[in-house]
């Protein structure tokens, strides 16, 4: 195996900040030059969170799905000693009104395999709820039968490396627009590693990279941004001609709903 970089909206979200509709609109310059991404508009991806260890090191992304819950990748290995940082754009700034949220419980999908990277999803129950605002709100979850066809133009965001050999990750949240691929097309690059609980995007001059893991791949549905993928793995050089691989959220929704209902 190549050295892989392991990279229904709830009514409780409240009418003021409905899911998937940022108060500050994102501006995506189509298939822009996160490798070959661009700075996001500050606050325009309000569900994007940074997962940080106790030293403040950003190691993965995640997405708010309600005031109490964050979804990320299982391979991120989140612990309750880590924190969720919401409302952040520039990790080099002390001026932002960020929320540093403790994690009460980590629910890793029991079917996750580090060998196949199947079922790469973890849910984080926050110890104290996020306070929704202009820059902090939830992404919509798809239903299990939602269809997001190949060719759909979607967006991914994160503080991951902008070059695979970069010494550090960018301070400012990066974004890129990229098309979904069919699994058949994706298998041309990745072969049998691609399973039905994965979805591919990119190979279009942009790529997710190390540090983006756990973050969102979102597509618009009925005018609201919906979580279609969770950044999972891809080329060890973050090649922009190889598709990035994401956990396919529609296939994982039954497990998500079960955990949310029981907790």
From Swiss-Prot:
Cysteine-cysteine disulfides: 19-140, 60-76, 154-219, 186-200, 209-238
Catalytic reaction annotation: Preferential cleavage: Tyr-|-Xaa, Trp-|-Xaa, Phe-|-Xaa, Leu-|-Xaa
Molecular function terms, GO-annotated: serine-type endopeptidase activity
Family per similarity comment: Belongs to the peptidase S1 family.
EC number of this enzyme: 3.4.21.1
GO terms classed as biological process: digestion; proteolysis
Signal peptide: 1-18
InterPro entries the UniProt entry points to: Peptidase_S1_PA, Peptidase_S1_PA_chymotrypsin, Peptidase_S1A, Trypsin_dom, TRYPSIN_HIS, TRYPSIN_SER
The protein's name: Chymotrypsinogen B
Phosphoserine sites (modified residues): 93
SUPFAM superfamilies named in the record: Trypsin-like serine proteases
UniProt keyword Secreted, yes or no: yes
Top EC group: hydrolase
Superkingdom assignment: Eukaryota
Main location: secreted
Keywords for the protein's UniProt record, in alphabetical order: Digestion, Disulfide bond, Hydrolase, Phosphoprotein, Protease, Secreted, Serine protease, Signal, Zymogen
A Pfam match: Trypsin
């Amino acid at each position: 195996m190549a050295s892989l970089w392991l990279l229904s909206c709830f009514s409780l979200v409240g009418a003021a900040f409905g899911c998937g509709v940022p108060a500050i609109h994102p501006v995506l310059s189509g298939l822009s030059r996160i490798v070959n991404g661009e700075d996001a508009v500050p606050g325009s991806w309000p569900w994007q969170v940074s997962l940080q260890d106790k030293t403040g090191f950003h190691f993965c992304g995640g997405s708010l799905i309600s005031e109490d819950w964050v979804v990320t990748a299982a391979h991120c290995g989140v612990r309750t000693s880590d924190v969720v940082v919401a409302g952040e754009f520039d990790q080099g700034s002390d001026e932002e009104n960020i929320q540093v949220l403790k994690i009460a419980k980590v629910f890793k999908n029991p079917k996750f395999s580090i060998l196949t990277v199947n079922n790469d999803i973890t849910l984080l129950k926050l110890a104290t709820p996020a306070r929704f605002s202009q820059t902090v709100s939830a992404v919509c979850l798809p239903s299990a039968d939602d269809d997001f066809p190949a060719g759909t133009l979607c967006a991914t965001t994160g503080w991951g490396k902008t070059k695979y050999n970069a010494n550090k990750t960018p301070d400012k949240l990066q974004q890129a627009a990229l098309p979904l691929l069919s699994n058949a097309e994706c298998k041309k690059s990745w072969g049998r590693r691609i399973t039905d609980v994965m979805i591919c995007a990119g190979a279009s001059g942009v790529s997710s990279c190390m540090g983006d893991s756990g973050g969102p791949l979102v597509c618009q549905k009925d005018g609201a941004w919906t979580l279609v993928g969770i950044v999972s793995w891809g080329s060890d050089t973050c090649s922009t001609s190889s598709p990035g691989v994401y956990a396919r959220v529609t296939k994982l929704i039954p497990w998500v709903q079960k955990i949310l209902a029981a907790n």
